[in-house]
Amino acid sequence: MAHNQDASSPSGMTYRDAGVDIDAGNRLVSMIKRSVASTHRPEVRSDLGGFGALFDLDTRKYQDPVLVSATDGVGTKLKLAFLTGKHDTVGIDLVAMSVNDLVVQGAEPLFFLDYFACGKLSPETAATVVEGIATGCRAAGCALIGGETAEMPGFYTEGEYDLAGFAVGAVDKHKIIDGRHISPGDAIIGLASSGPHSNGYSLIRKLVLGQSGPGLEADFNGKPLGEVLLTPTHIYVLPLLELAKTHAIHGLVHITGGGFWENIPRILPDATGALLKRSCWQQPEVFNLLQKLGNIAEDEMLRTFNCGLGMLVIVPATQADSALAQLRAAGEQAELVGEITSCKEGDARVVIL
């Protein structure tokens, strides 16, 4: 049967009648081509719009390469984007959550794919989100090589969408960072976060938007609180990859859901613990506000939020000073915040004084 693109002769129901606008999807692809191209790496072997994306791994850069993958979303932080109409930062969050998980294993992020799902596609909104994704990819040095836009009428509330991201990286097998070399006496360096990142937003929304909450328009140091809470997740990739070339990184901890109590033990070998000193880093004011709004106990704060530290770097004590200097020179706010300790069975693995 011949395909006739003349839509002027109605002959029955169309996909658009069901709520799916293929033309809007095509407009979106045209709108994002420049942003996607800005993330290009020489290993990319395909253009946007194919059935799949091709990436030619340059094995000459590795002795024994291992691929590392990660996937994540932005969670209910998206609700703040819907309420404020500010969609330019959540794409950065999407990339950050996955690439930060790659670098903690020593992997260089190579490429990224996204999934954007909505009830009715707004090409303008989606393009703004993808521009943020491209910004995140450039910050991490990875290519945005593909994605999926799913328009599903009746499935999502009008004006809302969901995001998922998928990242793949590579690391030489002998350079994998998995915590096996962590030992008592190692130094723990904390890298400052840009805010709550992408965790704890169900609680944040309850505190800020609840009956007695200040609301998103409330002034916070000269900015609307909603804008402050949408500050994108910090991407630590490039400074840490450079640090790994010059220092023996024994472990890296991405402080995400579960906070300090849940994430630090994931990297600790048996018979070791972590001692952190709260006085060694400053908790940003936004966390002080949240703690005050909910009268949140300190233990719960440390379980829910990063409290100002988005990444922990564990190095031999003899390398702590030079690691601090290099990280600061790279633009990171880095502080010596603790040390690795010996730990007996039954002892607390993480102690924060």
Swiss-Prot record:
The UniProt entry lists the main location of this chain as: cytoplasm
Extract the GO molecular function terms from the UniProt entry. Answer: ATP binding; phosphoribosylamine-glycine ligase activity; phosphoribosylformylglycinamidine cyclo-ligase activity
Q: Name one GO cellular component term.
A: cytosol
- Answer whether the UniProt record assigns the keyword Iron-sulfur to this protein: no
| Record Gene3D superfamilies | PurM-like C-terminal domain (3.90.650.10), PurM-like, N-terminal domain (3.30.1330.10)
**What catalytic reaction does the record list?**
2-formamido-N(1)-(5-O-phospho-beta-D-ribosyl)acetamidine + ATP = 5-amino-1-(5-phospho-beta-D-ribosyl)imidazole + ADP + phosphate + H(+)
Which Pfam families does the record associate with it? Answer: AIRS (PF00586), AIRS_C (PF02769)
Q: What is its EC number?
A: 6.3.3.1
Keywords in alphabetical order: ATP-binding, Cytoplasm, Ligase, Nucleotide-binding, Purine biosynthesis
Where does the protein end up? Cytoplasm
Question: Residues of the signal sequence?
Answer: none
* Entry-linked SUPFAM superfamilies: PurM C-terminal domain-like, PurM N-terminal domain-like
Which EC main class describes this enzyme? ligase
Which pathway or pathways does this protein act in? Purine metabolism; IMP biosynthesis via de novo pathway; 5-amino-1-(5-phospho-D-ribosyl)imidazole from N(2)-formyl-N(1)-(5-phospho-D-ribosyl)glycinamide: step 2/2
Concerning HAMAP family, the annotation shows: AIRS
- Homology family: Belongs to the AIR synthase family.
Please state what the protein is called: Phosphoribosylformylglycinamidine cyclo-ligase
| Protein source organism | Magnetococcus marinus (strain ATCC BAA-1437 / JCM 17883 / MC-1)
The organism's lineage?
Bacteria, Pseudomonadati, Pseudomonadota, Alphaproteobacteria, Magnetococcales
